[in-house]
Amino acid sequence: MSEHILVIDAGTTSTRAILFGRDGAVAGTAQAEITQHFPQPGRVEHDPQEIWQATLNCARRVLGNRPPESVAAIGITNQRETVVAWDRETLKPLARAIVWQDRRTADVCRALRDKGHEEAVHKETGLLIDPYFSATKMRWMLDNVDAVAQAQEDGRLAFGTVESWLVAKLSGGAHVSDASNASRTLLLPLGEAGFSADLCDLFCVPIEALPKVVDTHGEIARTDRAL
């Protein structure tokens, strides 16, 4: 019988794995720090591969000698606006993740506000046009990282927030994002079940590179048995 729920907390400075029993009691925890990269003033990056390895290592540590079958489900909580780009076929990251704290797209956001787009975007998404959110981070990667641009040209680009990246790695390729994360991209209208083509056009983000939006609960993918 599956006796545990495994929760992954992929935070800004560390990754944690917490194992809960059927009674809700904590059966074990493991934690690993995540390296912060500051390549220039105002820029903050993470290594997606480090996030993945920390997640995998913490999960294995917290499980100990328990069989994988003892875990009924895995839940993920994470730093929501951080953007990861990867090759959807190889599942390899194409660049460092741009973290929610990063301000490199401030000028792009200012230009969009100056053109009068903020009121409509706010009405549609509930968010303001700000570098904090994901859309302009995605556009920056396309404009400035050759591997990302090439992957888009080849039809292999996958964008996502951290939970989307981890689900892809855990499942062997599922490309999904739960609504609470997708809502922080500036690309998901309030009350809608999928990303907006018009918002993607405004922010110059290819909608085909985005994940499928799914509910925040229920089964969204199955783990790769090879893990």
Which residues fall in each region the model found?
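N-terminal glycine/serine-rich phosphate-binding loop of ATP-dependent small-molecule kinases
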Residues: 1-95, 123, 211-212
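Glycine-rich phosphate-binding/catalytic subdomain of phosphoryl-transfer
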Residues: 60-227
